[in-house]
Regions:
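Conserved pre-catalytic core of RNA-dependent polymerases
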Residues: 28, 35-36, 40-160
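Basic/polar low-complexity segments
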Residues: 1-52
């Protein structure tokens, strides 16, 4: 493993300016693109949403890496595997958040971003890559949703 030392990292203002130039500007897609018309003409069933089941929570935690870096919640997957009594409460709260997303607690989507130096001049912002540690609860909720979308896509959208 090559260790790259950041002797003089860029300032917070330089970092924010750089990333806003890449991600901060809204862009418009071509609404008349041919692929959009083709997709609109396809007869695809809609994905019906069913409440998250406790079995999905338990299954997710059983496959999660025990000591992955947690976000602001500081919850390690190990404890969620070891304390199955929490799964019922997590299930209830996830379903409440899906029903009323505006009531989701701010900490759920908060992350800690670390700027990892790649190579080159450590003063240059472009020579860093951001790594964001999201909360364990956020990763769990989005992981369950992603699995459902993947299953739906495999069963309903992809050709047989």
């Amino acid at each position: 493993m090559k260790i790259i030392e950041a002797r003089e990292p860029p300032t917070m203002a330089e970092t924010e300016t750089y990333w806003k130039s890449l991600w901060g500007e809204e862009s418009q897609h071509n609404e008349r693109a041919e692929w959009i018309r083709r997709e609109q003409e396809r007869k695809v069933s809609h994905m019906c949403w069913m409440p998250i089941q406790i079995t999905e929570i338990t299954s997710y935690f059983s496959k999660a890496h025990n000591w992955k870096s947690p976000g602001n919640d500081q919850i390690q997957n190990y404890w969620l595997q070891a304390l199955p009594a929490t799964h019922r409460h997590i299930t209830k709260n996830f379903n409440a958040i899906i029903e009323e997303p505006e009531k989701a607690p701010d900490w759920l989507t908060a992350g800690i971003t670390y700027m990892i130096p790649k190579s080159g001049d450590s003063k240059e912002v472009r020579n860093y890559r951001p790594i964001t540690c999201l909360t364990t609860m956020h990763k769990t909720l989005t992981g369950i949703i992603a699995k459902r979308i993947h299953t739906f896509g495999r069963q309903s959208l992809l050709p047989a």
